[in-house]
Amino acid sequence: MKENAYEMPWRTNYEAMAAAGWLVGATGAIAAEMLSELPPEPFWWMTGISSGMALYRLPEAYRLYKLQKGLKGKPLAFMELSHLQKVMAKHPDELWLGYGFEWDQRHAQRAYEILKRDKQTLLNQGHGKQMGSTWIHGVEPKEEDVYLPVGHTEGHTLIVGTTGAGKTRCFDAMITQAILRNEAVIIIDPKGDKELKDNAQRACIAAGSPERFVYFHPGFPEHSVRLNPLRNFNRGTEIASRIAALIPSETGADPFKAFGQMALNNIVQGLLLTSQRPDLKTLRRFLEGGPEGLVVKAVTAWGEQVYPNFSVEIKRFTEKANTLAKQAMAMLLFYYERIQPVAANTDLEGLLSMFEHDRTHYSKMVASLMPVLNMLTSSELGPLLSPIANDVDDSRLITDSGRIINNAQVAYIGLDSLTDAMVGSAIGSLLLSDLTAVAGDRYNYGVENRPVNIFIDEAAEVVNDPFIQLLNKGRGDRKSTRLNS
């Protein structure tokens, strides 16, 4: 279309009417010549002129017909995986998005002309009245493959649309291409779309590495891998912050939430002091049952590091302690009398202060924290989210965000939010926080920094503060995030 050309494509197709009229004239001339005794030459001339005018009008009539027909929607396009592999081979540095066109001035003008008319006379009259604004594809009858440079996806991608509009199928195409590029892929799916999972697994098989696919779903624990959402962290305080973020709170300065976070941090620091890796079940055990056992181990670990003859002198304090609580109290006294003047440890003192706290008041203050830990460690979720590496009775694979990324695995993580929205949201938030910690490691240490693709369906259900940080800073460690909403 020329810059100054005038186009009104949504009007009545007068060219088709004119072509039909000229064809009728040509047919009439032929019939008259056959049925009359008049000289044939004038009829031949009439037939030729009418046919020529009809042929002159037909191309524009057909162009308008195709353009107007496109407004009524197009059938769904399907592509074989083998064909997609051929497309990727021709465009190795580009992401195939689908079929479309480059929007320019003529498309803007056509859209403007549609929007100022009564659209119901033009739109959604074919292909079963598909949902959405299918006419947008119709403003250009000649669609072609649309590509995006892979490097541009590091700026993250947001896909929006109503239910059933095709957001998840768009994910399918992006996920398949990321898998075929041998990149790490993490799919977080709150609703548990079986077709999305099957397509990801099928792509791994097509790539020749079916072992890369790992599956996590609380609703199918027997088929699920075990996944530790607290495995990756840079500082112990991160773990307390992750779990405390799950505590329901109506105000920004909730004392119950603050106390719960402090209690979590004290337990975490005690575990790290004894060279134990925190997990959800361990945290619940010490918060619910009391920190006495951890106090004994933590004071012992610190005393052996900094206090000479610790193993000899501690016996005088613990010789009459015949219960765990009395042993913990003896350890507390030994720390304050002997160790603190020599080598104080603020992390250990936080744990000791928690041990000294009034038990009744403590139970009330962590009342909002315990339901969160209970639901994440109960029944089948316990072994799933707090795996024990040396458990000989459980042969399920153990993985975490760091392993998924470093081994270029394809992790489908179903949250089963339709069954239990609260648990699904909590698991999703913990996993996103774990991914943020991995991003921090990649920034600090540059662990190969292979591309990582994170796909989050129904993102509003799992987004938290650490994930927003990941969006802001994830490009530097080659994390590409795609959100559906």
Language model feature labels by segment:
Residues M1-I187, K194-P210, L273, R316, ...:
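Accessory regions of macromolecular translocation/handling assemblies
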Residues T481-N484:
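Conserved small/polar residues in nucleotide/adenosyl-binding loops
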